[in-house]
Each structure stands twice: as C-alpha cells, then as structure tokens.
Amino acid sequence: MKRFLLLLPLAFIGHQLTAQGQTSATQQPKHLLFDFRLNRTTAPLKIPLATQRTILGKVFRRYLTDEAKCNTQFQANGSDPLKAARTAGQIVPSIVGMSSGSFTAPGQTETLYLISVGECNASHADNFGTKRAAIFSGQQLVADVDADFKINIESKTDLNGDGLNELLLSGGDMNQGVLIETAALVDFPNGRRRVIEDFGTVTEDSCASGLPGSMAKASVIYLVDAAAGQMPKLRIENFQASCRTPKRWRFLSTGKMQE
C-alpha cells in the first residue's frame, strides 16, 4: 500500500514533466520588434535649410517652397492628377523623416530621407499627397522610390544579418475622429523598395469620434523563429482598450487586424 502511494506521485510527476516538455516545444520564443500601443512623439528634424534645398533639388526638377505659390488655376489632366501636379512642379515638398545606414548594399554609408511631396491639388482623399523615400550616398542620389504614404520611421534593423538595414515604416490618417495607422517592414536592395511584411492596420482609434462603442485597437509585432542568417518570422498580436481606460489593454487576436 505504501509502495502504491509512493508510485502514484512519481507517475503523476512524470506525466506533468512530459506535458511541460510538450508545451515548451510548442511555445515559440518571441522578441519584441515594435509596440504600437505606446504613445510616440517625434522630435523635429534638424536639417540645415541649405541641405534641405540640396536634397529636394536633386529629387525634384521643379518645386515650390510655399503653399501660397501654388497656382490656383492649375488643372490636372489625365487619370493621375497627382502625377500631373508633380510634372508641372505644382508641389511643396518637405522632409519628414531621416535615417542613416546601409540600405542599397552592404557596407554603404547612406542616408534615407522620407519626403512628403505635397502636391498642390492633393486632398484629404489623396492622403494630402504622395510620399517618397530618397537615398543618398554623400551628395549623390542613389535611389528615389515611392514610400506608399508612409511618413514615420519607427525602427531600423538588420534582422537577417545580411548587412542591409530594414525600416519599419508607418503612416496614418484621421477621418471623422477615427485614426487609422498602417505599417510595413521594408528594405531597399539595389535601390528598389521591397516589402518584407505588410502589417496592414496597426492602430485603429475611434475614441475622438464620440460614437457609441468607440475603442482603441493596436498591434504589437514580435520576432519568432529567429535563426542566424535568416529573416525571422513576424507575429502580430492585437489588443484593445476602452476609451475610459486607455492604458488597460486586453488581448484581442493574432494576425492582421480585422478592419
């Protein structure tokens, strides 16, 4: 009887250890890439005016320095009015982001600038104009590509250790009190923008709308299955909080946020 009582706990413990081992094997260790629940503040860029003019002058053949100089009589023809405005020089561009690193090839010392093109005829429906990423090596423009309306540089990484930096870029828009923010992880091999992962909507905050049922939703992005020399898998976890208790986030889902 005593022997049976001793064996029962041992068998139970062995079962528990086996179960724990199975759980550990299925759980993937994760490392934080970025948390969109956090409040973010961006310090003003400190780029000398002469440098700004040099950069913009190499990206755009013609541009304006003041919105007041936009031609109110300008009429864009064709199916792409923003392109027509750029061609006509009816733009008021500004530099909104900057990062140094190796973007087009390993070992390069480069600076990437995010530029809000500011087409004169751009409306709220156009997200107030297109955005571009311009990469310079010293004074030489080596890449000029569309930034898909992204204006914020959230982080710079080299996740697979290939010597090329990736950027986590985001961009947002508010309409009738609802803030929507999207994000993507991109790199620029050989000067071409490549989307590594499009995270879609990472912030949806309707608290400012005052509508019934308003809430805030935000994504947290993790790295999983990280191995040397390989791009890790990316995991999205979504959370929500009420407008009354904005700091009390509750887990909502995994994967891209449902719109």
Predicted regions, residues:
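Acidic, small-residue rich beta-repeat scaffolds with periodic aromatic anchors
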Residues: 16-81, 175-259
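A glycine-rich, hydrophobic loop/mini-helix early in the fold
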Residues: 108-154
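Sec-dependent N-terminal signal peptides
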Residues: 4-12
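Long, charged/polar, surface-exposed segments that mediate recognition or autoinhibition
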Residues: 129-133, 140-142, 147, 155-160, ...
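Repeat-based blade/solenoid architectures
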Residues: 80-97, 145-154, 202-218
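Short consensus segments that form the blades of beta-propeller domains
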Residues: 88-90, 119-127, 173-178, 211-212
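Acidic/hydrophobic-patterned starts of short beta strands in beta-sheet-rich repeat architectures
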Residues: 102-116, 158-173, 223-238
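Hydrophobic/aromatic beta-strand elements that line small-molecule binding cavities or substrate pockets
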Residues: 98-101, 133-134, 154-157, 183-186, ...
